[in-house]
Swiss-Prot record:
Its main location: other. GO terms for biological process: protein modification process; protein transport. This is Protein ELC-like. Residues 155-184 are annotated as: Disordered. Residues 234-255 form a coiled coil. InterPro entries: ESCRT-I_UEV_domain, ESCRT_assembly_dom, SB_dom, UBQ-conjugating_enzyme/RWD, UEV_N.
Amino acid sequence: MAPPPAKMQEIHQFLSSALTQRGPSALPYAENTKSLIRQHLLNLISSYTSLDPKTATFTHNDGRSVILLQADGTIPMPFQGVSYNIPVVIWLLESYPQYPPCVYVNPTRDMIIKRPHSNVSPSGLVSLPYLQNWIYPSSNLVDLASHLSAAFSRDPPLYSQRRPPPQPSPSIGSGYSRPLPPRQTDDAAEVYKKNAINRIVEMVHGDIVLMRSAREVETEGLLSLQSDLKRREEEINNGFKEMVIEKETLEQQLQVIAMNTDVLGSWIRENQGKAKDLLVDLDVDDSFECIDSLSKQMLECTALDLAIEDVVYSMDKSFRDGSLPFDQYLRNVRLLSREQFFHRATAEKVREIQMDAQVASIAARLHS
């Protein structure tokens, strides 16, 4: 049943006034969404007359307080053929309607939240698939209230405390207490206090979980940094050790070079005068003396072979440059090649004789 026209007029005026306020008292909703928020609340009140729009202070888990719109009242809950009313508060958060509202079951002083419950936490916070799968702009408060009623019908979230004698009446949540075993009646103020404490404990627990997650991330970052620093420390230490070893090696090599320099300098000073006397009568051919005639013949053949090789190379270059006629080039190459062959053959025979003599000498030493 729709609310009376007078009440709807009051609700229209209230929402228009609340959503058009400016300055510090303005509600924290985006300007382009205020008309949709107003329409959602009007549709909700028209479908569920037991709900009323209000403004109240909402405290976030981080301690921030902000004035928000809410729908406060009851949601019908059909259960075992009887309709009961479940008190709820639907908070329209700052991000509404892009994001879902926050719904709390708000038990009266003679009610207790069922624990455990599939959709309601001990603090009264409601969790539904419809809220988790909220889709803007198709999701709305009327459908949310319908899903709340259906979920509560499957599993009533509240039960009333028993007071002898039992009074069966369709009061809020009274029908749900019948299938439960008799239990001791708690003081209503104590129950309200317990529910408030449970809500605070849940908020603190949520803050602790967030802080713990942040600390874990920070700790992982510090451990990773510590590992990198240790690795760099090892690399620096290894590099320093290598530099020390290299320095010691260079110092040793420097000492050897200094000693060799001193020896070479002493030898030069001692033989500098002798070299001047030797240069007067020095014969290049007598600079190297062979130990025997075979070695001398080998040296001569090798020298002549290499000399002929140089001559042929020079002739080849002259022929390519055009300074040597072709017939003369062929004739000289033929003569030099024949002579070079003779010297190479002689050197090969001398090498064989030397090898035989060396083998005989080694055999004689082995038998002696």
